[in-house]
Amino acid sequence: MPTSSRNPSPPRRWGRWLSILFAAGVGALAALWVAVHTFDWAGPLVANSLRSVIGVDNVAALEDFVYGIEDRVNRFSRRSEAPKAYWRVPAVGVPKVKSVLGSAGTGGAGAAGGAEAARVGQDRPAFRPTDVGPMHQSWSAPGDGEWVPILTRGVRQPLMFKTLLHPDESRSWAELFVVALDLERLDVRLVAGSKEPQANNKAAESYQRLAKIPEPEQASVLAAFNGGFMTEHGGWGMFTDGISLVTPRDNGCALFAYKDGSFKIGTFSTLRATVPDAVWYRQGPECMAENGKLHPGLLASHVRKWGATLDGETVIRRSAVALDRAGKILFFAITNHTTAPVLARGMLHIGSPTVLQMDVNWSYPKFVLFEKDDPNGKLKALALASGFEFSDDEYLRKRSIRDFFYVLPKQPGLPKAESP
């Protein structure tokens, strides 16, 4: 019997549909990746949605996998890329010139002189951290390790400086941005997010979370930066406004602010006796370095705790806080494409004997400066450097889901902050 022509066999149709579905899936993942790296809301939305469906550990495994692929791609596509500078640094022998507040690079917003910010510290020696130079002399960009002043509105002398390091000899695109804050002239305050850290103390259930910079202080606020991990990522402690939102863990590293205006950082068990004198404290994982020594765990081949659930060797965006040896300078760091050991060594190079890692991942670490948006005079946020996610309303009019810190000039003659 002659064979009649028929429609394509089912296997062919299935193969075609599978190819279409595969292509659509790849396209969707690519679009999702672009969205996460473009919109500040996309990363948290995707991560939190996935955690509620497949669980925290599975999301962490997925993140490790995706970041691992990204690092392999970068190692191939950027292997001949030289370390990059983000702002101009005065040449050797040329007097240091005050830079203007704003995004990194040669531009940025002008430093408007607003009467709303106190003019502080004029009778004290000018603040300037000591240059540390590059971590790797043969693997650096011009100006690595040199402090560049940030001049903010209403303050005649720079109270904050910035520098850049390239801390990883195997990745030219690994970058460590550090801001130094003069704690003799600046107040740093801690604000709970609208949802994080989730409280685990009954006394904190009725705590009213403002989750943004109080309006009366927005006139003089200079900068703000991210806080720590979500409660489900380690249960690290937080205390502010006289309320313990999350019970501290003895082994956690903690940054303390005290009623006398001083700051300390270290393992919580060593600072527990100082809690009654604290205005606030915020914990994170074990100190990456303490008293000048790198944590032994960061030398191990497989470490998870410094990324909460992520592996310590995962190449991601990270943030950290530290103090100089005298406790007079607060350093805040934010990175691109670094492992936990690389971040820790970079902070030791800056001159910080004890280092506390804060939040990680693409969307969460951020440092923003605040300037007036001429001509309407509306305050807006500006990123420290290009490539960091933020919104104009960051910490101002938009409530933050996660906790954060903000920075004000100390008001001469006013009492220091007291916890209720």
What are these regions (language model features)?
Residues L181-R185, A257-S262, L323-G327, L369-D373, ...:
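Short acidic-glycine loop/turn motifs at beta-strand connectors
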Residues L190-H349, P353:
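Aspartyl protease catalytic domain
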Residues R16-V246:
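Zymogen propeptides
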Residues M1-G15:
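N-terminal Lys/Arg-rich, disordered targeting/topogenic segments
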Residues I329-A333, T338-E394:
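C-terminal soluble interaction/assembly domains
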Residues L176-A180, A254, C287, A320, ...:
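Conserved hydrophobic/aromatic beta-strand scaffold that supports enzyme active sites
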Residues A174, D250, I316, K398-R402:
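Short, solvent-exposed loop/turn segments at the edges of secondary structure
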Residues K380-P420:
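Low-complexity, Gly/Ser/Thr/Pro-rich intrinsically disordered linker/tail segments
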